[in-house]
Design a protein with these regions (language model features):
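ATP/adenylate-binding site constellation spanning eukaryotic-like Ser/Thr protein kinases
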Residues: 6, 22, 54, 74, ...
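Short, charged beta->alpha transition segments
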Residues: 11, 62-65
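An extended, acidic
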Residues: 65-200
Length: 200
């Protein structure tokens, strides 16, 4: 029905498209703009994550620790694609191709909070993405750092949540992931048979 008629009644809105179980609800606490603690509920997986800097991180009462992977070639990474990927040439396609050929594999889950939680749990070795909002990042960033991982922006600088560009790893892979990101240039849209609208 039209939006005007929907406003007249109660609605339930959910974000579990197609029954895909990788969705989450996350809450982060910031201190002076920096994530201090985070809690992430993943009902589709029956998992609850929480962590606090200096105290540690857990999933369903099991302690979390980032992976011990040392070499990018042995790593399993995760990324995502921003909502405006069809409108920008800086759309992460080049980075996805680059790392797909230089790692054990790259996954795309779709929930930034869970991607970060999986890095904190050592299931994934690293994560990068652009186009994120502070509410996408706050809880997961706290988890990764509480579990012994490293967080920064694409330039290796301390993360400012407002930039929307994050790199998260177990620590050992941080220089390798940053080096790869620096080497990537946007792919010409013709290589993936698309047209990007002209704009800034």
């Amino acid at each position: 029905p039209p939006y005007s008629s929907r406003r007249q009644r109660q609605m339930c809105i959910r974000d579990s498209a197609h029954g895909f179980p990788l969705f989450a609800c996350s809450i982060g606490l910031l201190r002076h703009g920096k994530p201090l603690l985070g809690a992430i509920a993943a009902p589709g997986l029956n998992q609850r994550y929480w962590g606090c800097l200096g105290l540690g991180a857990w999933c369903n009462d099991e302690p979390l620790q980032v992976s011990s992977c040392q070499d990018l070639a042995d790593s399993l990474l995760v990324t995502g694609f921003a909502y405006d990927r069809c409108e920008r040439i800086d759309n992460n396609y080049s980075e996805f191709c680059y790392f797909s050929h230089r790692t054990h594999g790259v996954r795309r889950g779709g929930a930034a909070a869970l991607d970060l939680a999986f890095v904190a749990a050592g299931r994934l070795d690293g994560y990068w993405e652009r186009g994120l909002q502070p509410w996408d990042l706050a809880a997961g960033v706290a988890l990764v750092e509480a579990a012994g991982g490293l967080i920064c922006d694409y330039n290796g600088q301390p993360l400012e949540l407002s930039t929307g560009r994050v790199v998260a790893t177990n620590g050992a892979l941080q220089p390798q992931l940053l080096k790869g990101l620096a080497e990537c240039q946007p792919l010409p849209p013709a290589t993936y048979n698309a047209e990007i609208p002209a704009g800034p």
